[in-house]
Amino acid sequence: VGALTPLAVAGLAVDVATRRHPGWRALTTAVTTWAVVGAQSLSHEGRVMADVLASGDLDAARHRLPHLCGRDPEALDAPQIARGTVESMAENTSDAAVASILWCAVGGLPAMLVHRGSNTLDAMIGHHNDRYENFGKVAAKLDDALNWLPARLTGALAALCAPEVGGNRSHTWATVRAEHDHHPSPNGGWCEAAWAAALAVQLG
């Protein structure tokens, strides 16, 4: 938690400094949100990966996969890379986009920056690591807590948008409710189950 204090203080300082200047407040919030929310880069990586896979260039697809997730791509074939891409995009839609916007709406810049810092710490040391084991566990638990509501909101939004990709809203939501707890992550299942049902593919 102490590692996130500077982010909270910085966000609070900007918030206080711009409180009497609505124009500057709106500008700093917009710029920070644009920098924090990873939706544009996420969609770009997804489109690039789709084009690479469609071209049949497996080496290029393996080279691009680390841009989306931490899996070792060398032993993966094209269907496995495609599945890893969709799974990563599903979870990152929640972590990078929905959660950041939600926390900004709830607590302004301080809350959004703390969430982003927590998410970054989890990505860096949240997995088992002998050197940072205890710190990593705290980072992972905090990230799970901060993404609890955004993940469920992401699942609901994916169900709502399912017809845009040929899916069915009620079927997608029913699948989310039935399958989300089969995922090892307390949050990842909500996102992945929704995307799997909407796209009619198998994930996880």
Please report, for each region that a protein language model flagged, where it lies by residue.
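Hydrophobic alpha-helical transmembrane segments
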Residues: 1-113, 118-121, 126-204
